[in-house]
From Swiss-Prot:
The gene is murB. This is UDP-N-acetylenolpyruvoylglucosamine reductase. It comes from Streptococcus suis (strain 05ZYH33). Belongs to the MurB family. GO terms for cellular component: cytosol. The active site is at R171, S221 (proton donor), E291. GO terms for biological process: cell division; cell wall organization; peptidoglycan biosynthetic process; regulation of cell shape.
């Protein structure tokens, strides 16, 4: 199959048996069969059409900041959008390709004195991933500013969905159900004062640095916020701050985070998540729901 891929997808940057731990914020994860870095939409379509024709599974990953890849890796293609990263400004509108870095996009907004993107100034990830999960923080979220997104449907068609059609919810969108790929997104911002925007971004960045364990690899916020509660507080109340399985620990700095402190594995993450859910449910009666996505095969399927 590798020779066929080299022949039929000639010119596309494809890496074979590539360890995904090098690409994830958790620094865990096994190898993927075929890791593709398309440069444009045409190359994405070529990869997807080839995969469908050959019966090879495929999926898209952004910056992998809120994802855990299992230790057995991923079969088939993983498409990384890193090379589709242009950001353009027209009036009060920013249009960004799916692979554009979210934090860097907020800096573009700041440069043009456009307000509305400040909430995302410290959120790691890509534009595509941010749209996919309706990323948010400090009272703001993608749904508040997104006008539309261009997507590639599973059938191979390029379509534009407006804000309403994307059916945003708390850390969710229709994209989590329909299997479409985000190609680009358009955001409507408002004119603002450069200094005021800069000060707000600095304030939010400072808050993030104070409260979050940025010094360790992690998958970001592990659980969604339960209605009327904070996941981190529930975990702390259950006595789990600092609890460790293998090389992964419930952060001492913020119990809503799990950090890879010493050569942790995806299995360590999964086991710790399951343990936290069980203990919190027993102590509070509240069942925590994962925000982080877990994908791939467990190690015992290798």
């Amino acid at each position: 199959m590798k020779d066929k891929i080299r022949l039929e997808l000639e010119g596309i940057d494809i890496r074979f048996d590539e360890p995904l731990k090098e690409y994830t914020y958790t620094k865990v994860g096994g190898a993927v069969d075929y890791l593709a870095f398309p440069r444009n939409r045409y190359e994405i379509v070529r990869i997807v059409e080839f995969a469908k024709r050959e019966g090879i599974p495929w999926q898209v990953l952004g910056n992998s900041s809120n994802i855990i890849v299992r230790d057995g890796g991923i079969r088939g293609f993983v498409i990384r959008m890193d090379k589709l990263n242009s950001v353009t400004v027209s009036g009060y509108t920013i249009e960004a390709e799916a692979g554009a870095n979210l934090i860097e996009t907020t800096k573009v907004a700041l440069f043009h004195s456009l307000s509305g993107f400040e909430f995302a100034c410290g959120i790691p990830g890509s534009i595509g991933g941010a749209v996919y999960m309706n990323a948010g923080a400090y009272g703001g979220e993608v749904a508040h500013i997104l006008v539309s997104a261009q997507i590639l449907t599973p059938a191979g068609y390029v379509e534009t969905l407006d804000n309403r059609e994307l059916r945003f919810g708390y850390r969710s969108s229709i994209l989590q159900e329909n299997g479409a790929i985000v190609l680009s997104a358009k955001f409507a911002l408002r004119p603002g004062n450069h200094t005021v925007i800069q000060q707000e971004m600095a304030r939010l960045t400072h808050l993030r640095e104070l409260k979050q364990p940025l010094e360790y690899p992690s998958c970001g916020s592990v659980f969604k916020r339960p209605l009327g509660h904070f996941a981190g507080q529930l975990i702390m109340d259950a006595g789990l701050k600092g609890y460790r399985i293998g090389g992964v620990e419930v952060s001492e700095k913020h119990a809503g985070f799990m950090v890879n402190i010493e050569n942790g594995t995806a299995s360590d993450y999964e086991n710790l998540i399951a343990h936290v859910i069980q203990v919190v449910e027993k102590s509070s009666g509240i069942t925590l729901e994962r925000e982080v996505r877990i994908i791939g095969d467990p190690a015992d399927t290798l």
